Amino acid sequence: MANIYYDEDASLDYLKDKTVAIIGYGSQGHAHALNLRDSGIKVIIGLLAGSRSIEKAKAEGFEVYSPDEAAKKADVIMILTPDTVQPALYQSAILPNLDEGNALAFAHGFNIHFGQIVPPSYVDVFLVAPKGPGHLVRWMYEEGKGVPGLFAVYQDFTGKAREIAMAYAKGIGATRAGLIETTFKEETETDLFGEQAVLCGGATALIKAGFETLIEAGYQPEVAYFECLHELKLIVDLIYQYGISGMRYSISDTARYGDVTRGKRVYEAVKPLYKKILEEIQEGEFAKEWILENVANRPHFNALVKKDEEHPVEKVGKELRKMMPWLGGRGL
């Protein structure tokens, strides 16, 4: 079982008299910065020239610097830019400004685990990853609560990297809910697997396969959309709040019987595929593919996204969502 830590297990003293630079001011960066500051920690922001977030960060009372200036001024540098941006940003702006005993921090382990960022031996390296979007991390903090999180230490130069990581997690509110200790390897590989096999790739593939099956059998696209996509939220919300067994308690006996008998067939079909997907992640095959795709300016990726955007489920959904006033007409 996992080791889980709470407020009493962590001390903010390890960040006392230190400056934390948050590189990036998006969803997570915004939440981390505000929560850390409200926890009494000195925070500065590092943003590239021309960033749309500069004025927002300044309006919220932060000193804003270029990433290299922020890294130079900070003791702890948390990099919260997209994974694909981090390696070049690190090489140009952060690495040249790292001092002995600094701490380099991440919210996802991809670039460290797959060797896209190789930190010098004279710094601490840790990870703190709240298991929720930035707005929730901030909202829960303001309510005196927190969002559970993960933390890991990759490199402990000072002998205090673990304590500093836990202090950071406490500063953003994670220890109020529960902080789970992990490794960069575990966080990275499980995060990628969840995205590919279940949360994004798996869910969207099931939706499209179900939708297409009904259409090909002669059913109306609108009805297929409701049954295979729209109602998914109802079930996921129940699972999210009550777990799988709790969800089953809330559905009809007919639905429950179909779940436990027919769902097993899907399980048996996808389990071997899941093992293959995980193997590709563990062996670095996916990381290599994604890195090379970005080097080539994403031709395959862009083509696949465009193709999926033209899927009939998108056209049908766009029209049906106009019938749902509770969505407020919001689009992307």
UniProtKB/Swiss-Prot annotation:
<feature type="binding site">
    <location>
        <position position="191"/>
    </location>
    <ligand>
        <name>Mg(2+) 1</name>
    </ligand>
</feature>
<protein>
    <recommendedName>
        <fullName>Ketol-acid reductoisomerase (NADP(+))</fullName>
        <ecNumber>1.1.1.86</ecNumber>
    </recommendedName>
</protein>
<dbReference type="GO" id="GO:0005829">
    <property type="term" value="C:cytosol"/>
</dbReference>
<feature type="binding site">
    <location>
        <position position="252"/>
    </location>
    <ligand>
        <name>substrate</name>
    </ligand>
</feature>
<comment type="function">
    <text>Involved in the biosynthesis of branched-chain amino acids (BCAA). Catalyzes an alkyl-migration followed by a ketol-acid reduction of (S)-2-acetolactate (S2AL) to yield (R)-2,3-dihydroxy-isovalerate. In the isomerase reaction, S2AL is rearranged via a Mg-dependent methyl migration to produce 3-hydroxy-3-methyl-2-ketobutyrate (HMKB). In the reductase reaction, this 2-ketoacid undergoes a metal-dependent reduction by NADPH to yield (R)-2,3-dihydroxy-isovalerate.</text>
</comment>
<feature type="binding site">
    <location>
        <position position="53"/>
    </location>
    <ligand>
        <name>NADP(+)</name>
    </ligand>
</feature>
<dbReference type="Pfam" id="PF07991">
    <property type="entry name" value="KARI_N"/>
</dbReference>
<comment type="pathway">
    <text>Amino-acid biosynthesis; L-isoleucine biosynthesis; L-isoleucine from 2-oxobutanoate: step 2/4.</text>
</comment>
<dbReference type="GO" id="GO:0009099">
    <property type="term" value="P:L-valine biosynthetic process"/>
</dbReference>
<feature type="binding site">
    <location>
        <position position="195"/>
    </location>
    <ligand>
        <name>Mg(2+) 1</name>
    </ligand>
</feature>
<comment type="similarity">
    <text>Belongs to the ketol-acid reductoisomerase family.</text>
</comment>
<dbReference type="GO" id="GO:0009097">
    <property type="term" value="P:isoleucine biosynthetic process"/>
</dbReference>
<keyword id="KW-0100">Branched-chain amino acid biosynthesis</keyword>
<dbReference type="GO" id="GO:0050661">
    <property type="term" value="F:NADP binding"/>
</dbReference>
<keyword id="KW-0460">Magnesium</keyword>
<keyword id="KW-0479">Metal-binding</keyword>
<dbReference type="InterPro" id="IPR013116">
    <property type="entry name" value="KARI_N"/>
</dbReference>
<feature type="binding site">
    <location>
        <position position="51"/>
    </location>
    <ligand>
        <name>NADP(+)</name>
    </ligand>
</feature>
<dbReference type="GO" id="GO:0000287">
    <property type="term" value="F:magnesium ion binding"/>
</dbReference>
<keyword id="KW-0028">Amino-acid biosynthesis</keyword>
<feature type="domain" description="KARI N-terminal Rossmann">
    <location>
        <begin position="2"/>
        <end position="182"/>
    </location>
</feature>
<feature type="binding site">
    <location>
        <position position="227"/>
    </location>
    <ligand>
        <name>Mg(2+) 2</name>
    </ligand>
</feature>
<keyword id="KW-0560">Oxidoreductase</keyword>
<dbReference type="InterPro" id="IPR008927">
    <property type="entry name" value="6-PGluconate_DH-like_C_sf"/>
</dbReference>
<dbReference type="InterPro" id="IPR014359">
    <property type="entry name" value="KARI_prok"/>
</dbReference>
<feature type="domain" description="KARI C-terminal knotted">
    <location>
        <begin position="183"/>
        <end position="327"/>
    </location>
</feature>
<dbReference type="Pfam" id="PF01450">
    <property type="entry name" value="KARI_C"/>
</dbReference>
<feature type="binding site">
    <location>
        <position position="231"/>
    </location>
    <ligand>
        <name>Mg(2+) 2</name>
    </ligand>
</feature>
<dbReference type="InterPro" id="IPR000506">
    <property type="entry name" value="KARI_C"/>
</dbReference>
<dbReference type="GO" id="GO:0004455">
    <property type="term" value="F:ketol-acid reductoisomerase activity"/>
</dbReference>
<comment type="pathway">
    <text>Amino-acid biosynthesis; L-valine biosynthesis; L-valine from pyruvate: step 2/4.</text>
</comment>
<feature type="binding site">
    <location>
        <position position="134"/>
    </location>
    <ligand>
        <name>NADP(+)</name>
    </ligand>
</feature>
<dbReference type="InterPro" id="IPR013023">
    <property type="entry name" value="KARI"/>
</dbReference>
<feature type="active site">
    <location>
        <position position="108"/>
    </location>
</feature>
<dbReference type="InterPro" id="IPR036291">
    <property type="entry name" value="NAD(P)-bd_dom_sf"/>
</dbReference>
<keyword id="KW-0521">NADP</keyword>
<feature type="binding site">
    <location>
        <position position="191"/>
    </location>
    <ligand>
        <name>Mg(2+) 2</name>
    </ligand>
</feature>
<feature type="binding site">
    <location>
        <begin position="25"/>
        <end position="28"/>
    </location>
    <ligand>
        <name>NADP(+)</name>
    </ligand>
</feature>
<feature type="binding site">
    <location>
        <begin position="83"/>
        <end position="86"/>
    </location>
    <ligand>
        <name>NADP(+)</name>
    </ligand>
</feature>
